[in-house]
Every structure is written in C-alpha cells, then in structure tokens.
C-alpha cells in the first residue's frame, strides 16, 4: 500500500427512508475542518434509491457528493452497502472515512473496515489530524473509561472512525461550488443475501434527548424508581426532558433511549441537571458540553462537581421537592 495515493476525507451520509440523519451533517462539519487542515477535498457519500438531500450536504460543507442510486439500496442492508462503499474506496482511495455511530453505522463501519483491511476507532469524542503525514488522531474513552486514548492507524488507509450524534457541530456553507457525481452501482444476486421486506415503526413516543434544551438526569443516587418520578415532575415544570445514567437504565428506572453517556447519547442542552450522578468519565463524555451544568449530590467530592457550574450538596429526594416548589413559584409570578 502506497499511503501517498490515499487522499481526501469522506463522510458516509446516512439516510433512512430518504431522510438525511443529523449525524451526517455534523460529521460534515468536522470533516470540513479536517479537510481544510490537510488541504484536501471533502466528499459526502450518499447511497439510496431516488435519494434526496444533496442540497443539504452541499450547504453543510461538502465539496463533492457521490451518489449511488439504485433500487437495491433503498433500504440499508449490510452486504449491499458494504459492497458499494468498498468498491468506491478501492477505486478512489480516500485517506479518511467517517461514519455516524448509529445502529446502521455500528453495523456498517466494522464490516467496511474489515473488507478494506484497515482499522476503525469507534465512538470517538474528538478528532484531530497530523498535517505532516495525514494521520488521523481519534480520541475515545478506554479501559472502562479510566483514561482517554488517542488512536492512530498510520500503516493502513482509509483511516476510519465512528462518531455518535451530538458530538460535533454542523457548519453552513453556500454550497454553490459543490460537485455532484452519480456513480455506477454494481450489485449481483450474490451480493444481496438479505432483503428488507417491510419496516414496522415502534408505536412508542420516544423523545430524542439529543434535541432537548433542558434535561433533568438521574443516576444511582436517586435511590428508587419512585424518587425518579420527582425528576419527571421537575422536568415538566421546566419544560424539559428526563434522562438517566447507565446505572439508572440498568436498574430499570428509565428506558435505554434516554441514557446519556459513552454507551448512550451525547447531549448539549442549555441546562443539564444531574441528580444523584457520581460523574464517571463515560457519563461526563456525553454531557460535558452542556451550556450550564447543575449537580445535586450528597457527596461534595463527587467527580460530577468538578464539571458542574453549580453544585447542590444534599439528598435528591429532599432537594428536588424544594426546587420544584420554587420553580413553580417563579414561573407563576412571571
């Protein structure tokens, strides 16, 4: 492998039922920064059938959009998407490939990396690049979250990383000079070992906590499911959303869809109220960029206090009723 032959930054533009996923636009924002630093082109890779969203990709930083349009790509399947992406990567030799750490990206990324005989750093929290050699420096928690590891893949290309939604910011550009190219798709029956027959959507009304402006989150220190209901009451008064740590999810106090942290979702609300959360690095990685962090904990030395803008030392079940009462009083007086 001649490393010098591999240039450019690619972003897999994930779409579901024709709708671009937010993480793809966020990755374009970070991809734009990396591409500018290296002085290379930023390419969005869009797969689907009668796909839309090209304009959005152009207006969020892409220099070029490669469109693989084929009826067999209408719905995501591992085999078909892997084949198309690997064929394009082998032909055009990108230096870096970013994929969103969604349920699709977590299935697709490792398969593509294995097929291309390269490495992949999963669930990155930050990304940088060495200009001299083009090496991608991907940082993520390691060893149970006890340290942050920066991982490089200097001997193989393309360098790959997955990033969860909410980690990076979108950028806006005019998109006037973005080039759109339709690429040939070569798929045979042997490449299509699975087929989507029907998509049945969940009837549950799940709130996307990554979009919430105010989050009241609870951890092990809340103590019980009954106490967890206090979080819901405070969130309702403030017009916010309830979330939880991994410990709260494992205890069955809140559903997995509302988990914040390295194994949950990354959030950036205006206000994040952490109730009974100790502040493990895995959790902090998912909420540390909140505009304001308020921590409620019996232990004034808990790690969460170090990242909080305001700390309240006390038992959640005693503090929350007071907060709820005062919030109601202030709101009713306005």
Curated annotation (Swiss-Prot):
Domain of life: Bacteria
InterPro entries: DHS-like_NAD/FAD-binding_dom (IPR029035), ETF_a/b_N (IPR014730), ETF_a/FixB (IPR001308), ETF_alpha_N (IPR033947), ETF_asu_C (IPR014731), ETF_asu_C_CS (IPR018206), Rossmann-like_a/b/a_fold (IPR014729)
GO biological process: fatty acid beta-oxidation using acyl-CoA dehydrogenase
Keywords on record: Electron transport, FAD, Flavoprotein, Transport
Quaternary structure and interacting proteins, as annotated: FixA and FixB form a heterodimer.
Keyword Flavoprotein: yes
A Pfam family assignment: ETF
Functional note: May play a role in a redox process.
Full protein name: Protein FixB
Residues involved in FAD binding: 271-299
Family note: Belongs to the ETF alpha-subunit/FixB family.
Alphabetized GO MF terms: electron transfer activity; flavin adenine dinucleotide binding
Gene (UniProt): fixB
């Amino acid at each position: 492998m001649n490393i010098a032959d591999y240039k450019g930054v690619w972003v897999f533009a994930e779409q579901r039922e024709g709708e671009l996923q937010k993480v793809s636009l966020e990755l374009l924002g970070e991809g734009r920064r990396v591409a500018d630093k290296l002085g290379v082109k930023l390419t969005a890779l869009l797969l689907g059938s009668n796909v839309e969203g090209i304009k959005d990709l152009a207006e969020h930083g892409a220099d070029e959009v490669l469109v693989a349009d084929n009826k067999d790509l209408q719905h995501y399947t591992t085999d078909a998407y892997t084949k198309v992406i690997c064929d394009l990567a082998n032909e055009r030799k990108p230096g870096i490939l970013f994929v969103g750490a969604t349920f699709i990206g977590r299935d697709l990324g490792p398969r593509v990396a294995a097929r291309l005989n390269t490495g992949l750093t999963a669930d990155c929290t930050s990304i940088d690049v060495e200009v001299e050699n083009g090496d991608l420096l991907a940082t993520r928690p390691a060893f149970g979250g006890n340290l942050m590891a920066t991982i490089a893949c200097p001997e193989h290309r393309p360098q790959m990383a997955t990033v969860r939604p909410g980690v990076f910011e979108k950028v806006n550009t005019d998109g006037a000079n973005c080039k759109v190219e339709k690429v040939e798709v070569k798929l045979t029956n042997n490449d299509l070992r699975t087929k989507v027959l029907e998509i049945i959507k969940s009837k549950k009304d799940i709130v996307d906590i990554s979009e919430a402006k105010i989050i009241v989150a609870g951890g092990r220190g809340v103590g019980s499911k009954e106490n967890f209901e206090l979080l819901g009451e405070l969130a309702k008064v403030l017009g916010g959303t309830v979330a939880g740590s991994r410990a709260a999810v494992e205890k069955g106090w809140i559903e997995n869809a509302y988990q914040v942290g390295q194994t949950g979702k990354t959030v950036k609300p205006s206000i994040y109220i952490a109730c009974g959360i100790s502040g493990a690095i895995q959790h902090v990685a998912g909420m540390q960029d909140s505009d304001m962090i308020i921590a409620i904990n019996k232990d004034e030395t808990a790690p969460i206090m170090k990242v909080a803008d305001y700390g309240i030392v006390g038992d959640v079940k005693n503090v929350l009723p007071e907060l709820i009462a005062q919030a109601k009083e202030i709101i009713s007086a306005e």
